[in-house]
Amino acid sequence: MSLRVHTHSPSTQGDMAFNLTILSLTELLSLGGLLGNGVALWLLNQNVYRNPFSIYLLDVACADLIFLCCHMVAIIPELLQDQLNFPEFVHISLIMLRFFCYIVGLSLLVAISTEQCLATLFPSGYLCRRPRYLTTCVCAFIWVLCLLLDLLLSGACTQFFGAPSYHLCGMLWLVVAVLLAALCCTMCVTSLLLLLRVERGPERHQPRGFPTLVLLVILLFLFCGLPFGIFWLSKNLSWHTPLYFYHFSFFMASVHSAAKPAIYFFLGSTPGQRFQEPLRLVLQRALGDEAELGAVREASQGGLVDMTV
């Protein structure tokens, strides 16, 4: 089970032109995503008042930034029709780092949706009992656990640490498949509960703020980010996938990572004043610091939004 992506040569000139168009759009979109995530990362790290969800989004922006960097570089040989080829070690390192950031981003989205769901369903109890440094600990745990999984995959499926073990490699990819399914199911359940609470709760006529952002980001993953994970599972579990799905999944992965900053700034901007407000203020508003978060800011002084991590 090699981690290098092999694709069949396009059968016609039209197929080749289509593939090159998709790859070129992927590169351009990734470049725009680098800019957007870089701005979001800088604002979240420097200019935005810290709350637990800003810490989560800071980590998400960091994972997306690294993912897009690896994504852009990894598809250059195919875009140039193999006129430029990276050494095997460099290519494998790029795609494993890209997959690592993909799993980190997915895990962080699950953590965000779960916390927001709990804060919305049980505002008083959850906000009062929430440990002060929970967000920092959860983010650190996700990065470390995903790194260990990535190292195990690298050791079992490549020659980084000796001869690969194909049996162990197959077992690990089955574990990844179960993990991906569990994370997606958890995300769907928490987002559904959050949606029902937002639409049917007593706060449905009030500003939605951060819960809306969470729901939109989850929908973005399900439609744009999930195909990339399905492609990697199908490739490494020897499932047959058509060539067009390969290009489609890579393009949609770029959309997924590049569109998040646009969602942040779109939701945080005031209608009629878009592109006129400071980006810091727009991002602050998207995080819910100027409205309620989890339906109740007044439920707990020093609660989930106002608490500095």
Swiss-Prot record:
GO terms for cellular component: plasma membrane. InterPro entries: GPCR_Rhodpsn, GPCR_Rhodpsn_7TM, MRGPCRE, MRGPCRFAMILY. Its main location: membrane. Residues 1-21, 81-91, 154-168, 234-247 are extracellular. Residues 43-59, 113-132, 190-212, 269-309 are cytoplasmic. It is found in: Cell membrane. GO terms for biological process: G protein-coupled receptor signaling pathway. Pfam families: 7tm_1. PROSITE patterns: G_PROTEIN_RECEP_F1_2. It is a multi-pass membrane protein. Keywords: Cell membrane, G-protein coupled receptor, Glycoprotein, Membrane, Receptor, Transducer, Transmembrane, Transmembrane helix. It comes from the Eukaryota. Glycans are attached at residues 19, 236. GO terms for molecular function: G protein-coupled receptor activity. Gene3D superfamilies: Rhodopsin 7-helix transmembrane proteins. The chain crosses the membrane at residues 22-42, 60-80, 92-112, 133-153, 169-189, 213-233, 248-268. Orphan receptor. May regulate nociceptor function and/or development, including the sensation or modulation of pain. Belongs to the G-protein coupled receptor 1 family. Mas subfamily. This is Mas-related G-protein coupled receptor member E. It comes from Rattus norvegicus. The lineage of its organism: Eukaryota, Metazoa, Chordata, Craniata, Vertebrata.
